[in-house]
């Protein structure tokens, strides 16, 4: 019989499990407290119990980790200065769902070269979110499927469903 299924698959590589990745970049009690507190503040703002403005601020998507961390440090400083009026959440998107040609995002193509090392992309994304959480800056991201949130949702304070 002539093979007709999966004829264009070059190779298979199982992904790291969410539990394994979380072991590599664990959430401390301090970080989980920050995430829970930030989620509660966002809920209060959306429901009208907190009169501050909620602002999700950041680049289209993260591609340069160092530039992203520099941005986060600057945003944290500004956030602290305006926290009585505006609750700032850093927009940290790792995927580009509406991009069909070109770079698809840090998780899918962390090296920006078409290599699609998704495991490395997941590691970079979780590490980045962990670093931002350590700054006590709330993070917001877009969730496009039921898989990726298993790796990063515990470090995310706000989510868009894409």
Q: Where are the model-predicted features located?
A:
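Active-site-facing alpha/beta catalytic cores
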Residues: 1-5, 85-162
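N- or domain-start disorder-to-order transition segments that initiate the globular core
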Residues: 8-47
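Short, basic, glycine/proline-bearing loop/turn elements
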Residues: 28-29, 60, 112-115
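N-terminal beta-rich core of secreted/periplasmic extracellular enzymes
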Residues: 31-42, 76-89, 95, 125, ...
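Hydrophobic, well-ordered secondary-structure segments
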Residues: 45-46, 67-70, 76, 106-111
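Solvent-exposed alpha-helices and their adjacent loops that cap or buttress functional pockets
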Residues: 47-49, 132-133
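Short glycine-rich or small-residue beta-strand-to-loop segments that form or flank ligand, phosphate
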Residues: 52-64, 89-93
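Glycine-rich anion/phosphate-binding loops
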Residues: 62-82, 115-127
């Amino acid at each position: 019989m002539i093979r007709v299924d999966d004829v264009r698959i070059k190779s298979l590589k199982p992904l790291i499990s969410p539990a394994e990745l979380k072991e590599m970049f664990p959430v401390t009690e301090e970080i989980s407290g920050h995430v829970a507190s930030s989620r509660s503040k966002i809920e209060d703002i959306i429901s009208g119990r907190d009169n501050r403005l909620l602002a999700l601020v950041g680049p289209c998507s993260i591609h340069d980790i160092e530039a992203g961390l520099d941005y986060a440090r600057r945003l944290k400083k500004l956030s602290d200065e305006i926290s009585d009026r505006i609750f700032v959440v850093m927009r940290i998107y790792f995927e580009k769902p509406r991009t069909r040609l070109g770079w698809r995002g840090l998780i899918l193509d962390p090296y920006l070269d078409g290599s699609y090392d998704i495991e490395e992309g997941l590691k970079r994304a979780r590490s980045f979110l962990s670093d931002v959480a350590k700054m006590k800056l709330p993070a917001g991201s877009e969730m496009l499927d039921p898989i990726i949130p298993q790796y990063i949702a515990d470090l995310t304070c706000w989510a868009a469903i894409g």
